[in-house]
Amino acid sequence: MGIPTRTGARLAALATMLLALASPFAAAATLRIGMSDDPDTLDPAVSGSFISLQITSVMCDKLIETDPQLTPIPGLATAWHWSADDLALTLSLRTGAAFQNGEPFDAAAVKWNLDRYRSSPMSKRASQLKPIKDVTALDDHTVRIDLSEPYAPLITMLADRSGMMLAPLATMAAGESAGAHPVCLGPYEFVRRVPQERVVLRRAEHYWDPSKLRLDEVQFVDIPDATLRLTNLQAGQLDLIERVAPTDLDTLRGDPHLKLAATPALGYQLIIFNLAHGPQSDSPIGRDPRVREAFEASIDRDTINQVVFAGQYIPDNQPESVGGPYFDPDHPVPHRDLARAKALLEAAGQGRVGFTLLISNDPVSAQVGQVIQSMAAEAGFDVTLQMTESVSLSQAADRGAFQAAMQIWSGRTDPDQNISIWVACDGFLNRGRYCSPPLDKILGAATRTTDTALRAGLYRQAAAIYLEDRPVLFLQHYAWLWGANAKLRGFAPTPDGLIRVKGMSLAP
């Protein structure tokens, strides 16, 4: 049976690599995880891909962790409290912890990391931490974060990349190359990376809680083809695979040596448009919101879900799940309307509109692109699909070398980090350079209160703006579908899609 891969050479390379994984090097205490992509960088300050977050979450503990229900729990900060005016957050830090190279973990290290995240020219966390005015080490194990204004998402930020602690001396010595060999404070430390093949981690010698480490090694293996991931899971060459193709679920369920783990996801898929980022923004789809509206009217989210995802996902037009507290019911998921699409193009003075859609070159993304291409053609759009590696796609989008690009976001518990990142003027994933000062004002107000009802009202006001301007089109929310060796113990899928390796083991 033919298995689709990137190229014949890529398949040969994967076969060679997987034979190596089946060798004595892959001992019983080695967890081998099949991933859908290669990480961009392993420096939490710079990275923007979910695969990078997945790997760095195993290497780098955060100041605040989350439990399987995504409730904040102690991490490297054992306790925290807000000041009465919500302008200062004080953290009590864990004692007896050290970085993977032996550097001490203390308040000075926390201050250095937070200052790096919010001020380094390379940092993609700077806009997320903009409300931080100062970070002060009160003593060796107490840190105070002072804010210029109340900032509700801060706890969520410290439970994300911005809360990951890197060893200051090692990171300063590495400079811009810190992501090539990151040194964190976490359960498994970096060993090596073979680009487009794997990242290898080993049990950290200095970890503060060794009782939770039941694996000697963790390998993240890059296999973009979902069916190929499943094939290697069945062959025993992998122990856990992410993003099982919905069309492969019956095969997985029918194998007594495997098990399925599934949960609704915070993550979603979307298309971003280049509105003002370099020469490629000068196109009808970038210049005119009526053309983007016509494009949305030409596609059918339900059809995409049924054809590509076997009905397992949730069609959506917003970054929050349908029916959730921050979803705007006044703007429900629109149905396909070809007549309206054609009328909008005519009103915009356009005949047929051509543009290039940049997509990742995994088979599932290709299928989504092909379905969209076919539907949009009926309305008057000539969509050229440009397939590329996910890292190359992100790099192209960062420099404005795109007209439209398909993206994935793993989702966050705080609504600000599901929308501001894409549409705020300084959003770190606002690659199309959309900017609406009235929208920024509303989004800013929503971060300054913790009142759910008030925030929901503000995010609905925001939705009325970005759904009209359409700098992005949300397509669907995912379900996390994992395949696992039946011998794997301790794995529990969570809505954020992260693998919590601590406590996991492989039975003999």
Question: What spans do the regions from the language model cover?
Answer:
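Surface-exposed binding/hinge segments that line
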Residues: H81, S92, A126-A170
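N-terminal lobe/hinge region of extracytoplasmic solute-binding protein
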Residues: G34-A84, W112-D115, A180-C184
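Gly/Pro-rich hinge or "lid" segments in bacterial periplasmic/extracellular proteins
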Residues: Y151, A159-L213, E217-Q219, L338-A339, ...
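Alpha-helical secondary-structure segments
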Residues: R32, D106-N113, D140-D146, G186-P187, ...
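Ligand/substrate-recognition segments at binding pockets and active sites
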Residues: P195, Y313, G324-P325, P334, ...
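Append "and occasionally in soluble cytosolic enzymes with long acidic Gly/Pro-rich linkers
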Residues: R203, A261, G286-S374, Q461, ...
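Ligand-site clamp/hinge motif
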Residues: H206-T251, P289, Q373-S374, D382-T384
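Extracytoplasmic/peripheral linker and loop segments enriched in polar/acidic and small residues
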Residues: R290-E293, N305, D382-L393, S420-A486, ...
